[in-house]
Design a protein with these regions (language model features):
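A short hydrophobic/aromatic micro-motif that marks alpha-helical segments and, especially, helix-coil
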Residues: 12-15, 78-79, 165
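Surface-exposed beta-loop-beta
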Residues: 163-173
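Outer membrane beta-barrel
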Residues: 19-162
Length: 173
């Protein structure tokens, strides 16, 4: 019995040495958009700090190219006073990446907004024109596929219901 116990302890030590340290598969998503303003001259007493919008979420890699992502969008609505905030589910999606191809399904980010935001790149100065003038929604219910041919050329296609993430269709038709 003692010999069996010693052999078991030795084999556990060997397994512990061979075990790889597993990297974290998930990551938190935290983005906060705010403004600070102050007046000059006659408007010098006009100062303010404002939290426009926050994104809180989590992304987890399941393995074999599969990942899931969920993001809450919290911000103010034009329908209520400035002190109230509303929360929406912006993303609830599953993705599969194989080589240079990516498939997304669920409540996904729309591809035209990703392209425009990367092109503009100065969200801290001003919203991009699609967001400013409400040319579509930044997320919607549907599927998308993207393929990267090279670093300088990609193609994508998206099929969505067109209602955005704030007005999810609840019934048929």
């Amino acid at each position: 019995i003692i010999l069996a116990g010693i052999l078991a302890c030795m084999s556990m030590g060997a397994q512990a040495q061979n075990a790889k340290v597993e990297e974290p598969k998930g990551k938190a998503i935290v983005q906060v958009f705010g403004n600070f303003s102050t007046g000059f001259g006659a408007e010098n007493s006009s100062r303010g700090f404002e939290l426009e919008r926050s994104y809180l979420g989590y992304e987890y890699k399941l393995g074999n190219g599969l990942s899931v992502k969920s993001v809450l969008d919290m911000g103010k609505s034009s329908d209520v006073s400035d002190n109230n905030r509303l929360a929406y589910v912006k993303n609830a999606m599953i993705s599969w990446k194989k080589g240079n191809m990516t498939l997304n399904g669920g409540l996904i980010s729309t591809t035209q907004f990703n392209f425009q935001e990367k092109f503009w790149g100065y969200r801290y100065i001003m919203k991009d024109f699609q967001d400013m003038y409400k040319f579509g929604s930044s997320a919607d219910l549907g599927i998308s596929v993207a393929y990267k041919f090279a670093d300088w050329i990609t193609a994508d296609a998206i099929i969505v219901n067109g209602e955005g993430y704030k007005k999810i269709q609840k019934n048929d038709g």
